[in-house]
């Protein structure tokens, strides 16, 4: 579950990758599976981690940096140097828990917008690590939520698509200069 990629946890003056924001078509595409885990993928994962830390995030999906690949990086405790980040390549949720929980989410691709989203509290996920080895983890709480949020990005879904409170959604998007028409409601 730990990552073998060494990255300093901290803000860089110039993050290596550029974030894309709500309204950008790249965020609405279904990302492509990664056929081979190689140095190019490991470099992308490292740069994604550096970008995530520089942006003060706890998760980042490749489409958020304009890369159409099924790769996510996560660190739910970025202030703790002992907590290793996760790199999940071709992640797939195999099982959802029965208990649903509302929790406030935000997104590096929609800065300043924070709204409640209801998601399963527990999941089981299969993926490949940065060496290409198959892995499977059970996650609950914050880790479960971040994995689900980032996998949504890989499928062209953004957290605002899942927000049920339309009044709060419209208000926050407008305050931050985002268009409500960029939201694609999940039925």
UniProtKB/Swiss-Prot annotation:
InterPro entries the record matches: Peptide_deformylase (IPR023635), Peptide_deformylase_sf (IPR036821)
Glycosyltransferase among keywords: no
Molecular-function GO terms, alphabetical: metal ion binding; peptide deformylase activity
Annotated EC: 3.5.1.88
Pfam family, one: Pep_deformylase
Domain of life according to the entry: Bacteria
Binding annotation for Fe cation: 107, 149, 153
CDD domains cross-referenced by the UniProt entry: Pep_deformylase
Keywords: Hydrolase, Iron, Metal-binding, Protein biosynthesis
Reactions the enzyme catalyzes: N-terminal N-formyl-L-methionyl-[peptide] + H2O = N-terminal L-methionyl-[peptide] + formate
Gene3D superfamilies hit by this protein: Peptide deformylase
Cofactor or coenzyme needed: Fe(2+)
Residues of the active site: 150
GO BP term, pick one: co-translational protein modification
Cofactor binding note of this UniProt entry: Binds 1 Fe(2+) ion.
Family: Belongs to the polypeptide deformylase family.
Annotated function: Removes the formyl group from the N-terminal Met of newly synthesized proteins. Requires at least a dipeptide for an efficient rate of reaction. N-terminal L-methionine is a prerequisite for activity but the enzyme has broad specificity at other positions.
Protein name: Peptide deformylase
The organism's taxonomic lineage, starting at the top: Bacteria, Bacillati, Cyanobacteriota, Cyanophyceae, Oscillatoriophycideae
